[in-house]
Amino acid sequence: MNKAPTTLIIMDGFGLTDPGPGNAVSLAQTPQLDRLFAEYAHTTLSASGLDVGLPAGQMGNSEVGHTNIGGGRVVFQDLPRISRAIDDGSFFENAAYNKAMDDCLEKGSSLHLYGLLSDGGVHSHIQHLYALLQMARNKGLARVYVHAFLDGRDVSPTSGKGFVADCQEKCRALGVGKIATVMGRYYAMDRDNRWERVQLAYDAMVYGEGIQNPDPVDAVAQSYENDVTDEFMEPVVCDPDGTISDNDSIIFFNFRPDRAREITRAIVDPEFDGFQREFFPTTYVCNTEYDASMPNVLVAWPRIPVKNGLGEYLSAMGMTQLRIAETEKYAHVTFFFNGGVEKQYPGEDRVLVPSPKVATYDLQPEMSAYEVCDKCIERINSGAYDVIILNFANCDMVGHTGVLQAAVKAVETVDTCVGRVVEATLKMGGIAMVTADHGNAEVMLQPDGSPMTAHTTNLVPFILCGAGNELRPGRLADIAPTILDVMGLAAPQEMDGQTLIVK
């Protein structure tokens, strides 16, 4: 017998705010979403700050959003967890950090600190780097090198120069640390197997190859003069003595796993074959668990498991489920949605659609949405699934480019696809829910008219198609209990979210 699915459609980066010249959501032609808002019960959800386990006022992001949606509860995030440890002093007692630094003292080797030099709080926080520098000073380490990955997505595209200058000043004040390399996250934090990019980052940090400039602040300024903003800054070597070599220690201070895996694997995995390089031993600390299969690493902050999240609970109830997304958001509907669990649960199928191989997604704002849509509808029509979790990446990934017209096209693409998926779900007698994990495309311009590439703290929509006449406002943690509610299932006690349906 064919199943009538409950389909959750996550429009990544689709927030709500007043219409305006930089609002790609309101500027776009969205006949499908307009119709859904007119015909079905809808409400708004909080997707930032304390409501998703982040510090008050901190913008949400895809990892946090999917973890909260899948968990059915507010999941306390790594950013405040690590920041709180700095405040209470337990940070400096961390076993992995101490092992890395003690190995340097024992072997007379160098300590390398690398990660995203930003206060965006999505992948990292610069204050965590500063705490590591303070710890290195307290231990009396002599050779400490910072490899700075510039952001330009979760913060202003030209904020990197200021962060580099601040980092230099912090090193001077502490009397420890030198910036060895500077580069855009485009190279060091790829997540789409673009090994030619990762290799340029690797070659700069390990071999000292790349543009040479002893002044890291000037290196960033030169990049701006060439009209290359932070995210895309080519790797620059500032101190050729600061290359990574045998028996050195490395602490990767990013706490978000998805963009930390590739460069980490290139260094720690003897079986790595993304590009030619020689393996050598290091003491390597991942700030959080980037990948359970990663060899030769220590984990500073092991993940606190999310027990009885939606995926695990549906599986235990004998239900079937599908997770589908293109490459850029595949980890979010699987690993993050499952609370940091890589393995598939019994009854859980996964479909990965490759993201297009373009330099930046403003060049192809439709990305792979139409193929994701087609494959999802095939699976809906198969009648094989009780629950389908689907992500459209466009509004977020194109929003990050800062190109307004491309973001408008991205919203219009998602609108078309959402309409088709909802229609297919309802035709099968199912229920469709349309929501987002955080805002982005609804604010594409800064107040001064310059591009806005970061996420927002705006509310996100929630539309319930095929069930329920009245909904209350809520937060992302309320989505899983709502899914269980429309399926006639009681939520497990671990879920503290509440159904959005007003009884």
Task: List PLM regions with ranges.
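Feature captures the catalytic ectodomains and active-site-proximal regions of enzymes
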Residues: 1-503
